[in-house]
Amino acid sequence: MSAKLISVTKPVVEGVNTAEELIAYAARVSNPENQINNKTASGLLKYCIRHKHWSIFETAFMTLELKTSRGIAAQVLRHRSFHFQEFSQRYASVMETPPPHQARFQDHKNRQNSLDTVPEDDQTWWATEQEKLYAQSMELYNKALEKGIAKECARFILPLSTPTTIYMSGTIRDWIHYIELRTSNGTQREHIDLANACKEIFIKEFPSIAKALDWV
């Protein structure tokens, strides 16, 4: 699971140098004489967050490249306010064998949770069996392609753990909501890891907003 910055809004207004400054600039649309006031921008952003004036955070945009599994990608794609481009198994061959994933016990008190208490012997068994299955799956997939079977047909035998790449684009308001939701309890562990990788990039690009959100 990883995330990488692809693009972030670059203002062309003189005196407005970052996407974060642009959000503050847009927030002052009704006060044009004071729009370019970067000294008080962080305080304004904090005020807007405290009072839930979220619309200003729709004036800047960020795109990240996410490396994850098809299983987690299905959860990511449910965030419909975003715009996505995903690696197509229909048009491109899958070259990478999935890595084994951690085993966790089902939490019977909370079905959204899993418990990291699986014994080491069972973890080893689980990893070994996954490696066997993934090797068989990739062998069958590649054999199908060699026989001329279309990628769109051969892909159906690939497991949900198959790696994929997604470009995820959204407003800063979208990213705040996504990160808040997917780093919280009730999210699958692997998705939390991915959302935290996104959060690290967000903090670097939008330090004042991140501070106002108590992320740092």
From Swiss-Prot:
Enzyme category, top tier: transferase
The UniProt record lists the keyword Hydrolase: no
Reaction(s) this enzyme catalyzes, per UniProt: dUMP + (6R)-5,10-methylene-5,6,7,8-tetrahydrofolate + NADPH + H(+) = dTMP + (6S)-5,6,7,8-tetrahydrofolate + NADP(+)
Entry's EC annotation: 2.1.1.148
GO BP, one annotated term: dTMP biosynthetic process
Binding-site residues for dUMP, renumbered to this chain: Q75, V76, L77, R78, E86, F87, S88, Q89, R90, R155, R182
Cofactor mode of binding and number, as noted: Binds 4 FAD per tetramer. Each FAD binding site is formed by three monomers.
Motif ThyX motif in this chain: 78-88
Pathway annotation from the record: Pyrimidine metabolism; dTTP biosynthesis
Domain called ThyX: residue spans: 1-216
Role according to the record: Catalyzes the reductive methylation of 2'-deoxyuridine-5'-monophosphate (dUMP) to 2'-deoxythymidine-5'-monophosphate (dTMP) while utilizing 5,10-methylenetetrahydrofolate (mTHF) as the methyl donor, and NADPH and FADH(2) as the reductant.
Assembly description: Homotetramer.
The name this protein goes by in its record: Probable flavin-dependent thymidylate synthase
Species in which this protein is naturally found: Paramecium bursaria Chlorella virus 1 (PBCV-1)
